Amino acid sequence: LDVIRPADINETEAAWRLAVESKTRPTALILTRQNLPQLENSSFEGVQKGAYVVYTPSKKANIQLIATGSEVFLCIAASKILEEKEIYAEVVSMPSWNRFVILPPEEKEKVLHLPYDARVSVEMGSTFGWGGIAKYNIGIDEFGASGKAEDLLEHFGFTPIQIAGKISSFFKE
């Protein structure tokens, strides 16, 4: 099963195309109902590979934030907050973990070029599986809740300020 969780309309179009063109395995598209903005550099090739860099900080990155779907935008906002603390976070959109992990090592290293200890995954779901990609994982390892989106983001620690705070605590030194 090829699971794809796109972050914007371009990634969604690419995911749909890949699903329709696939002759060897089924595809699950995990879409949001949120009205999300458009990434500046989303690409078919990035979705095809499973992951690619979508945001570069103002100075050389010393950490990478890896996210899927709507969390990509939360990571971009958190990255901008982190710059004030001199933590420079590059953001990677990983719409398809399945596609990414089967790439040759040299292709994976082009995307995840920083050391394992400098990577953080951000996923509004289980952190299960992310340990193979990132040392630090921000997720929800409990049952969800019902309510307004803004209230739930705050409750589970997924506002950009809360994400930036967690990341800062990982890299205190």
Regions found by a protein language model. Give the residues of each.
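A short helix-loop
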Residues: 5
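Thiamine diphosphate
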Residues: 12-15, 19-173
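Mobile "lid/hinge" segments at catalytic clefts and subdomain interfaces of large enzymes
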Residues: 1-2
